[in-house]
């Protein structure tokens, strides 16, 4: 399996919505996801299965005044126990470093 990690863009919104419905009792709405996409404080890293083009994981952070607040993290149940969440966090930490985050916390 080949997994691509990248920043969220408009092509990922429906996949994040589907994954949110799969993983959470109270999933995010499409409007909420689009709001996050357009929020200059929010950064999201997605994991995409390159064979299926399916969004299989995501993690988000709000970066405010040098601090990163992790807002959400999810991995599809059928892809768990493969290190995807760990890799998402590593990629997210790299993003936070580019914005000079000194601290990162889980909301």
How would you describe each model-predicted region?
Residues 4-80, 86-99:
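Acetyl-CoA-dependent GNAT
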Residues 70, 104-106:
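Conserved hydrophobic beta-strand within the GNAT/NAT acetyltransferase core sheet
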